[in-house]
Amino acid sequence: MAILDVLSFPDERLRTVAKPVEEVNDEIKQLVSDMFETMKDENGIGLAATQVNRHVQVVVMDVSEDQNEPRVFINPEITRKDGSTISEEGCLSVPGNYAKVERAEAITVKALDQNGEAFELDAEGLLAICIQHELDHLKGKLFIDYLSPLKRQRIRKKLEKEARLAAKA
C-alpha cells in the first residue's frame, strides 16, 4: 500500500475526464487500496482517482463516524436524483476552503465494487452528497465550479499564494 499525492486546484489535471475501467484487475485493486490509505492519511471521507492523477472511474469513500464502512464505486453512474439540499462542502483538492453547494437530497447509483460485481445503492444525506461530489471529479468538475466566478477566483488566488509560500519554505 502507498500514500498517493493529491492534486490541488488549480492543477489542470483535475479537469481530466476519467475513462471507464475495462477490467477490475490487480492494478485497479491496488489503486483502490492506495486510495483508501491516502484518503485516511488526509482525513477525508471520499476520494476520486482523478484527485491522485489516475484518470479512471474509481471512487472510494467512508462517511461513517468510525471510518469502518468503506465503499468502492467503479464506473459509477447516478440513475436517479430526488429533492434538493444545500450543505457545506470541502475537498482534499481545494484545501482549507468550504462553500455551500446545492445537490440532490437522495440518489440511486449503480457501479461495480472492488471485485467487479455490479450493485445498485439508494443513498441520502451525507452519503448522497459525497457520491455526487466524488462523481463530479470523474467528470473534471470541482465543487467550486458551483460558486460564482468571483468566489472561485478568490480561492484560486489564495491557493496559488499558499503554493508559492510553500515552495519558498
Curated annotation (Swiss-Prot):
Keywords: Hydrolase, Iron, Metal-binding, Protein biosynthesis. Belongs to the polypeptide deformylase family. The gene is def. The active site is at 134. CDD domains: Pep_deformylase (cd00487). GO terms for molecular function: metal ion binding; peptide deformylase activity. HAMAP family: Pep_deformylase. Binds 1 Fe(2+) ion. Removes the formyl group from the N-terminal Met of newly synthesized proteins. Requires at least a dipeptide for an efficient rate of reaction. N-terminal L-methionine is a prerequisite for activity but the enzyme has broad specificity at other positions. It catalyses: N-terminal N-formyl-L-methionyl-[peptide] + H2O = N-terminal L-methionyl-[peptide] + formate. It comes from the Bacteria. Gene3D superfamilies: Peptide deformylase. One of its GO terms (biological process) is co-translational protein modification. The lineage of its organism: Bacteria, Pseudomonadati, Pseudomonadota, Gammaproteobacteria, Alteromonadales. Fe cation binds at residues 91, 133, 137. Its EC number is 3.5.1.88. It comes from Alteromonas mediterranea (strain DSM 17117 / CIP 110805 / LMG 28347 / Deep ecotype). Transmembrane segments: none annotated. Its cofactor is Fe(2+). Pfam families: Pep_deformylase (PF01327). This is Peptide deformylase.
